Amino acid sequence: MTFPYYASVEQLMRDRSELARKGISRGRSVVALTYTDGVLFVAENPSNSLQKVSEVYDRVGFAAVGKFNEFDRLRRGGIQWADMRGYAYDRRDVSGRQLANIYAEALGTIFNEQAKPYEVELCVGEVAHYGRDTEPVLYRITYDGSIADEPHWVVMGGNTEPVINSLKESYVEDSALKDAVGFAVKALQAGTAGANGSEGRALGGLEVAVLEQSRPRRAFRRIKGAALEALLPEDFSPGQTEGGGDPAPESGDSKDAKDN
């Protein structure tokens, strides 16, 4: 007589967590940090078309790592929810905390009820409405629905430990935008360094955007081209600076399966 396969609940949760963490670690790093006028997002992203950073609503931005099709589905769902709430009530009734809670609930439900968890990690950033003097806020949402507000910066994806250590050493509160970009780029470069003195890989293309509190309505702005080059450190010379020009994907890679 054969017995059905049995795994304890604890083992199932451990297996799901390990699967999600491995998927997230394969993605390239994203840094979100606060600066004097809002929130800065800097992502290592060699792709022109697959964006890891996005506007969600007037004063709210979104960044993610992991499986593109999974976090893009969450991003679009958040945009639709925010549009409906802003239309039904008032645009000021849409907040980053509400969106972060919705993402956390969705990821928690998927993690607990579906066979495969989403291999994603999210960051929701928010700046105060124009004319208000409130500090920017960053929320981290993990694959299992855990949510935490971070006071200064968030690091997700890839080799996070050296990126975090670099920010601990260099980050200064209320820095100017150029300085903040320098902190983020230096941290991302630390994440690409080889272990034990071995040669690391070059930092790929950058996707850069900000939430600017000084903008009257829509705070989100992408930084590209000459504007981005003027903000980059003098010793930074990647092949791309706008998240473009990636070589053709390896066989089997697609928009639906690619890790970002």
From Swiss-Prot:
GO terms for biological process: modification-dependent protein catabolic process; proteasomal protein catabolic process. Transmembrane segments: none annotated. It is found in: Cytoplasm. The keyword Cytoplasm applies. InterPro entries: Ntn_hydrolases_N (IPR029055), Proteasome_alpha-type (IPR023332), Proteasome_asu_bac (IPR022296), Proteasome_sua/b (IPR001353). GO terms for molecular function: threonine-type endopeptidase activity. The formation of the proteasomal ATPase ARC-20S proteasome complex, likely via the docking of the C-termini of ARC into the intersubunit pockets in the alpha-rings, may trigger opening of the gate for substrate entry. Interconversion between the open-gate and close-gate conformations leads to a dynamic regulation of the 20S proteasome proteolysis activity. GO terms for cellular component: cytoplasm; proteasome core complex, alpha-subunit complex. The keyword Cytoplasm applies. Component of the proteasome core, a large protease complex with broad specificity involved in protein degradation. The 20S proteasome core is composed of 14 alpha and 14 beta subunits that assemble into four stacked heptameric rings, resulting in a barrel-shaped structure. The two inner rings, each composed of seven catalytic beta subunits, are sandwiched by two outer rings, each composed of seven alpha subunits. The catalytic chamber with the active sites is on the inside of the barrel. Has a gated structure, the ends of the cylinder being occluded by the N-termini of the alpha-subunits. Is capped by the proteasome-associated ATPase, ARC. Belongs to the peptidase T1A family. This is Proteasome subunit alpha. It comes from Mycobacteroides abscessus (strain ATCC 19977 / DSM 44196 / CCUG 20993 / CIP 104536 / JCM 13569 / NCTC 13031 / TMC 1543 / L948) (Mycobacterium abscessus).
